[in-house]
């Protein structure tokens, strides 16, 4: 999928193309409001190809295999979007980011789609990891606990769970629970389908 399409559009509005022509898909889209931009950041997973025929995938300089990246666009009205920007390209396959904001930091859960390690710090394949940053649109070229979260995405944790499509939801005070000791989200929940883990 390269564009989102309405199939029930009686008004003739059948969709808006947001991805580039050489992208193989526009998977797991999510939008998050960015106060500093006064707009939504819409991010999604893609596999890039060498041209718009999408017959030859771009391959990783680390693994030699095709891999997935994440891009983002900015919108205020969900009718007009900026051109997509490469958000996460580490030369390792990653998909399905979800974002929450707690205090001044954005926290990003993403799945490592590699079968094994994805660099020096993400050591397990097919599992979700956690990063944080004060800048939602900061780009990522390497996962590292040494990245300054003031300007980039700092790796905090990995091997969280082996699932795709994580989602973080803010709970009401009456239903809040502590997800992980020492982490600042006592009122956040990550739903997990345990029937497949």
What is the predicted role of each segment?
Residues 1-197:
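Carbohydrate-active catalytic/glycan-binding domains of CAZyme proteins
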